Amino acid sequence: MSAASPASIIQELASAAKQYENNESGAREALIAQSRALIASLEVPSEFIQHTFWSQPALSAIVRLATDVNLFQYLKDAQEEGLSAEALASKTGMDVSLFARLARHLVAMNVITSRNGVFYGTALSNGLAAENYQQSIRFCHDVSRPSFGAFPSFFKGNGYKTPALGTTDGPFQSAHKVDISFPQWLVGNPPYLQYFNSYMSAYRAGKPNWCDNGFYPVADRLLNGFDASVSDVLLVDVGGGRGHDIATFGSQFSPLPGRLVLQDREQVINSIPADESRQFEATTHDIFTTQPVKNARAYYMHSVPHGFGDEDAVKIMANLVPALAKGYSRVLLNEIVVDEESPVMSATNMDLIMLAHMGAKERTEADWRSILTRAGLKVVNIYSYPGVAESLIEAELA
């Protein structure tokens, strides 16, 4: 199948623009995807090479440098007045010539703007000034970028084979000259552990979550049909960390017809600040043991089997089976489902992050169906939101 023509892509862009003006779900993501497709349809190979190997690496390095000199913060604070090259060079401790050259590339890449010798922040650069994004930039540049850079030499050396899950011999180890796993390295390098946590938080920030309008039909699939005589528990968030997802769910659908239960390891649960206003109960649970809360309306997992191999993923899912009420309880997996026919960049990005750092992978629909079937479950439906990497897999007892 040949690639779409520029004319047809422009038509799709116009349609997405109208949807965006009408605030329709997925319109923003469609605009971005079609804009990238238009560029790809117009670029010649020499432009692609320059963009890929000059423009983007330079941008990455300059944005990383900007976190050391607080460039985006200064521009944000200046607001509509902006700052001259001389003023910004003074604030950042750079010489004017160097600053101007770096800043011009940020302008060329639409990160900041300039007019009559004055530089201004944009919505994008002002957002990047936030500390969680500053830390995310440091993690991605210092840790991930070298790991990707090791792909050619590492895979040539290992005969182009996929590393073992949880490997101590992968692209990450090759790039950083270590022989320990990525999680072990993070623990031994505290600043980057914090940067990684910020990155994971920032990764999901500003994106639709599974219970938003237009994603998973919560009212139809969970609230309607809830039966307190079967169980007074509406939702169990299994391995839910400190409760971000379940708190979001509770706030969006209050008042709730049933209880919300958060489960995670003891050290995680103990780290949750006391809050009498929260709508969920926090309890300890090991995902490799049988689920103790019986007959709940739904058991939700967000990226829980994600980091495990297939055999462990089957065990995790099978531990839910004894707790499920036939024809009533639902299993909800909030996971990336890689589309083999029309993959989206947000999904392939995360798949390659997993490959680079841990020898892991994101799963296709066929992969998820196989795991759930082996665990004694069956897929009812897979709900997706346009342009969003993570889907919502609904399953039930087979």
From Swiss-Prot:
Pathway per the UniProt entry: Secondary metabolite biosynthesis; terpenoid biosynthesis
Residue numbers binding (4E,8E)-10-(4,6-dihydroxy-7-methyl-3-oxo-1,3-dihydro-2-benzofuran-5-yl)-4,8-dimethyldeca-4,8-dienoate: 144, 199, 265, 267, 303
Biophysicochemical property: pH dependence: Optimum pH is 8.0.
Binding residues for 4-farnesyl-3,5-dihydroxy-6-methylphthalide: 144, 199, 303
Ligand binding (S-adenosyl-L-methionine): 264
Mutation effect (residue 335 to A): Completely looses methyltransferase activity towards demethylmycophenolic acid (DMMPA)
Gene3D superfamilies registered for this protein in UniProt: Vaccinia Virus protein VP39, Winged helix-like DNA-binding domain superfamily/Winged helix DNA-binding domain
Coiled coil location: none
Keyword Lipid metabolism: no
Residues annotated to bind 6-O-desmethylmycophenolate: 144, 199, 265, 303
EC number: 2.1.1.-
Biological-process GO terms, alphabetical: methylation; mycophenolic acid biosynthetic process; terpenoid biosynthetic process
Localization terms from the record: Cytoplasm, Cytosol
This protein's UniProt keywords: Cytoplasm, Methyltransferase, S-adenosyl-L-methionine, Transferase
EC main group: transferase
Effect ascribed to mutating residue 306 to A: Completely looses methyltransferase activity towards demethylmycophenolic acid (DMMPA)
Binding site for S-adenosyl-L-homocysteine: 197, 203, 237, 239, 244-245, 264-265, 286-287, 302
PANTHER family per the UniProt record, alphabetical: HYPOTHETICAL O-METHYLTRANSFERASE (EUROFUNG)-RELATED, PUTATIVE (AFU_ORTHOLOGUE AFUA_4G14580)-RELATED
Membership in a protein family: Belongs to the class I-like SAM-binding methyltransferase superfamily. Cation-independent O-methyltransferase family. COMT subfamily.
Assembly information from the UniProt record: Homodimer.
Protein's job: O-methyltransferase; part of the gene cluster that mediates the biosynthesis of mycophenolic acid (MPA), the first isolated antibiotic natural product in the world obtained from a culture of Penicillium brevicompactum in 1893. MpaG methylates farnesyl-DHMP-3C (FDHMP-3C) to yield MFDHMP-3C. The first step of the pathway is the synthesis of 5-methylorsellinic acid (5MOA) by the cytosolic polyketide synthase mpaC. 5MOA is then converted to the phthalide compound 5,7-dihydroxy-4,6-dimethylphthalide (DHMP) by the endoplasmic reticulum-bound cytochrome P450 monooxygenase mpaDE.
Name this polypeptide is given: O-methyltransferase mpaG
Gene that produces this protein: mpaG
